[in-house]
């Protein structure tokens, strides 16, 4: 018996082809922080090794990790390039900072560069925003980056660190050598 012919069988059918995404390797710059009392660094050597292992190029300004007790040799062994000149770091596609860049630092940025940093938006002025716009910099405020569950992981981590730091500072100030009574938990 003959099979019935359906009109749909003769229509042009869409074919799903696999499209390979071209993976873009990034160059990521880590600057030495210039804000007073800022001892943090944007990436630790272990994170650098992970990114380098995924074919990204990391350029670390010489001495960027010293305040956080990371030597340049540790970054170098993790696969980062150590740049003596700040200008070399600013040639990267992406700049990571722990503190917002100053107006002077924004001058070093080039068009279509990406800045990932806390921007402290409630504290910045229109001149700051205008300079970023003039430079055509895409600025991502770390403090507003959300996780899949809607939380702000960087804010949570910084809050935890601030809480631990407050306890340790208070304990230090309460010691007899710092002028305190030398009692950390009185009455217990």
Task: Please tell me what each predicted stretch does.
Residues 1-27, 33-35, 106-188:
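Glycine/serine-rich phosphate-binding loop and adjoining beta1-alpha1 elements at the start
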Residues 13-131, 135-137:
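An N-terminal-biased, well-structured beta-alpha scaffold segment characteristic
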């Amino acid at each position: 018996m003959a099979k019935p012919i359906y009109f749909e069988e003769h229509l042009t059918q869409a074919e799903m082809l696999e499209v390979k995404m071209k993976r873009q390797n990034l160059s990521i710059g880590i600057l030495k922080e210039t804000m007073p009392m800022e001892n943090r660094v944007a990436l630790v050597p272990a994170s650098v090794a992970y990114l380098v292992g995924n074919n990204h190029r990391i350029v670390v300004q010489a001495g960027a990790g010293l305040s956080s007790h990371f030597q340049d040799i540790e970054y170098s062994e993790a696969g980062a390039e150590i740049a003596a000149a700040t200008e070399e770091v600013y040639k990267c596609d992406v700049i990571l900072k722990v503190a917002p860049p100053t107006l002077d630092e924004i001058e070093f940025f080039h068009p279509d560069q990406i800045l990932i940093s806390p921007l402290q938006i409630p504290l910045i002025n229109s001149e700051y925003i205008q300079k970023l716009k003039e430079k055509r910099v895409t600025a991502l405020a770390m403090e507003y980056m959300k996780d899949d569950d809607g939380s702000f992981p960087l804010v949570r981590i910084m809050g935890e660190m601030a809480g631990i730091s407050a306890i340790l500072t208070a304990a230090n100030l309460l010691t007899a050598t710092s002028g305190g009574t030398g009692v950390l938990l009185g009455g217990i």
